[in-house]
């Protein structure tokens, strides 16, 4: 999967205060996911992430930070319609910056992501899937905060899906469409609209192929 987020139409200015060109900044993540069922009631999964962050410095120069990260998780089936999940997110995730080419006294440094420990559960109530989890955010050595999340999904004709949820300070609504490309139900297209408390909005489109 590829995830992109950024801001465009940033008004650049010269040192005198006069306007220069329009600039933009962006973050990109490419994620490769693997999962394996070990026993009928337990599965293991992992994400490998390639990260990149571009910051505008001048009209023609940008400062780029890049790095890698990992997520691991275990999924346990606790009943016919219930599952329990445990996950560790952003293991060793970081941006590494080199400002030597931008500033005469620049240096190499690393921005490390907080590591998040999550535990959650899912249940199916007459076709309505309810998912919730709670995350413990740590600054590697110390506890920082608690992050709760809740989501619901309703399937129609085993092909169309309607979703809603709250998490990370954002409320979201979405749609999903499942179809067969090479075999039945092997492809998924999903769209989500989200908004935070400051009324900042985001649109996310994703595609998944199962094999």
PLM-predicted stretches and their roles:
Residues 1-211:
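Outer-membrane beta-barrel porins/channels
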């Amino acid at each position: 999967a590829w995830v992109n987020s950024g801001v465009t139409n940033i008004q650049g200015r010269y040192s005198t205060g006069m306007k220069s060109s329009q600039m933009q900044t962006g973050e990109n993540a490419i994620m490769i996911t693997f999962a394996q069922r070990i026993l009928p009631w337990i599965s293991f999964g992992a994400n490998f992430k390639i990260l990149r962050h571009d910051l505008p410095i001048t009209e023609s120069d940008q400062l780029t930070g890049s790095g890698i990260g990992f997520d691991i998780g275990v999924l346990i089936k606790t009943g016919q319609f219930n599952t329990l999940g445990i996950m560790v997110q952003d293991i060793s995730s970081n941006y590494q910056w080199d400002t030597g080419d931008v500033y005469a006294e620049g240096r190499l440094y690393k921005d490390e992501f907080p590591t998040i420990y999550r535990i959650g559960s899912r249940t199916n109530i007459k076709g309505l899937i309810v998912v919730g989890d709670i995350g413990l955010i740590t600054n590697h050595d110390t506890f920082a905060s608690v992050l709760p999340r809740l989501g619901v999904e309703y399937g129609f004709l085993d092909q169309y899906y309607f979703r809603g949820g709250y998490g990370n300070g954002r409320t979201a609504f979405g749609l999903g469409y499942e179809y067969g490309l090479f075999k039945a139900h092997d492809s998924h297209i999903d769209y989500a609209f989200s908004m935070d408390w400051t009324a900042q909005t985001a649109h996310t489109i994703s595609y998944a192929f199962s094999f």
